[in-house]
Amino acid sequence: TLPAIDGGDDLITPLNVLVGGQASPTDSGSQNEGQDTDAPKAAAGVQVKSADLEGDWPTRAEDALRRHYSRQERAVMSALGAKADGWWDQPRWDRELAEDLYRLASACVDEMGREACTRLGFNPDEDWDLPRTQAYLQAVTKARARWVNEATRRQIEAVLAEAGTEGVPTVFDRARSQRAAAGAAAFIAAMGSFATVEASKQAAPGQGTKTWITGRNPRPTHLAMNGETTPAWTDFSTGLSWPGDPAMGPDESAGCNCTVSVEITH
């Protein structure tokens, strides 16, 4: 399923309720097409690993985050230098980063989804449909943008309290040198996992399985899932649909570099 997201301008609590319109992102997309929810019979098939589809997307994502942090630093330092009370513009930063991440997500999910279809033996021109993912990607990237910016704001507030304005550039130096790479790797791992699972669901509804592959320094809950296999349209034992799934909030998804493999059974 395409799970509800904790965050984003269109979302309110509880996590699976949207403001008006559809009840949740699960109301649209390939998960609502009458899939056979019985576990597919085991059969030999081609496995596709999401990590194999990432290409240079982590580098592109890191570049986008670095640019965001630099743009943010210029604006924040200018406002602090002018002794302005409103030195932090959360709506602006959330909007700008969400737009950057959505453009990135749309491009990488389309490329990886098409490639996953091809590797699974299907024709992406017939069996892959990016528009079916776009509403969900918009919700995901809004949530991710807010999480990133809230972390930056908290770090700036802590530095201002301890060292004053002079310490603020260190927040952005660390963001560019450390957070950008880690955040980019986690974001692309999540998008790759989503694209791979979604490709299997679109191309062969009710016929795919997915397997959790633990990454580096995993959470204990994620380590416990290493090798866990489930039908592609159901959740893993933790309630996550794939690595990086933000449905359960940043505590279960932020920084996650686990991946997934999918297989079509016949």
Show the residue positions of the predicted features.
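A residue-level signal for conserved active-site and pocket-lining positions in enzyme catalytic cores
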Residues: 1, 184, 222
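Pocket-edge structural micro-motifs
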Residues: 1, 214, 262
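Charged substrate- and nucleic-acid-binding regions of tRNA-handling and nucleotidyl-transfer enzymes
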Residues: 2-26, 252, 260
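N-terminal leader/targeting and assembly helices and adjacent pre-domain segments
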Residues: 20-208, 232-235, 263-266
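Short amphipathic
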Residues: 209-215
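Short Cys/His-based metal-binding microdomains
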Residues: 217-266
